[in-house]
A protein has these predicted regions:
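Outer-membrane beta-barrel translocator domains and adjoining extracellular loop/strand segments
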Residues: 1-3, 44-51, 100-108, 150-157, ...
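Surface-exposed strand-loop-strand hairpins of Gram-negative outer-membrane beta-barrel proteins
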Residues: 1-17
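Residues on the lipid-exposed face of transmembrane beta-strands in outer-membrane beta-barrel proteins
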Residues: 20-24, 34, 73-77, 91-93, ...
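Residues that define the transmembrane beta-barrel architecture of outer-membrane proteins
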Residues: 14-18, 57, 65-71, 85, ...
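Transmembrane beta-strands of outer-membrane beta-barrel proteins
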Residues: 32-34, 73, 85-91, 123, ...
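Outer membrane beta-barrel transmembrane domains
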Residues: 81, 156-254
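Transmembrane beta-barrel strands of outer-membrane/channel proteins
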Residues: 34-38, 89-95, 131, 140-144, ...
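Detector for outer-membrane/organellar transmembrane beta-barrel domains
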Residues: 112-193
Length: 254
């Protein structure tokens, strides 16, 4: 739903990631990219007496996973329509290399949503376009991941589709910035080969601000702050009040 409810167990999840992106332009209109996400996930909560047989008297309970997540490979082709509107079409695949067998301190496998990998190979599709408006750039895109089936533990992640609109100012050589409005829609997950997983799926709207600097002609640094505008999620789910991201981009010469 879209209402806040008490978090009696004081549960929280810290999800940190470092993504290395490598792109190579085969031609001016055809590019291949690889995304390598290194992830660290820490979930912690306070259990009441009897909630967990391994910690019967209650207390703090931690679950964590870390390592290289699922690698994404993508090919993008750019075409111009109506003599001036560039359209970038992307097609790729999410690999299943990330670990999905991390355990807690008692040797019990932690839930699929806390693993760094998914255990399935899924296609990813995207379409993106941009248009210069004086000193601004207006852009937008749609990105989707289609779940193809269950992993070896019988868990199937829901499909995801994300729509976003950006307005960026890039005229200044040293500083640039922009805002983004995005919508994320996720369908339900399934476990044990077909059972509906509660507390998963729903839709969210976000507002994101961005600021960056061009340190050199080849090197950029960037920071983004994302805040939820509205969230309508299935059952009860943990939500984040904001997300901060730091990034850098280096352009290699040819």
């Amino acid at each position: 739903g879209d209402r806040f409810i008490p978090n009696y167990n004081k549960e929280r999840t810290n999800n940190s990631s470092l993504t290395i992106i490598s792109s190579y332009g085969i031609t001016d209109h055809f590019t291949i990219s690889a995304f390598f996400p290194f992830r660290y996930i820490l979930n912690q909560k306070v259990l009441f007496r009897g909630q967990n047989p391994n910690l019967y008297n209650g207390g703090k309970y931690f679950r964590e996973s870390y390592g290289l997540g699922d690698v994404l490979l993508q090919a993008r082709i750019q075409r111009t329509f109506f003599n001036e509107i560039p359209i970038v079409l992307g097609i790729g695949v999410k690999l299943s290399n990330g670990k999905i067998n991390m355990t807690d301190e008692f040797g019990e496998r932690i839930s699929d949503n806390l693993q760094v990998g998914t255990g399935t190979v899924d296609p990813i599709l995207s379409i993106y376009s941009s248009q210069d408006i004086k000193k601004l750039v207006l852009s937008g895109g749609v990105f989707t991941r289609i779940s193809t089936g269950e992993n070896i533990y019988g868990y199937k992640y829901g499909n995801e589709i994300q729509t976003l609109i950006n307005l960026d100012y890039i005229e200044n050589h040293l500083l640039y910035g922009g805002v983004q409005v995005s919508h994320l829609l996720s369908t339900r997950d399934y476990y044990e080969y077909g059972k509906i997983s509660r507390d998963r799926g729903g839709e969210s709207y976000f507002l994101t601000g961005k600021i960056g600097t061009k340190a050199t002609d080849n090197l950029d640094f960037e920071m983004t702050l994302q805040m939820p505008l509205h969230q309508n999620l299935n059952e009860s789910q943990l939500v984040s009040p904001f997300i901060i991201q730091f990034g850098s981009l280096y352009r290699f010469g040819t």
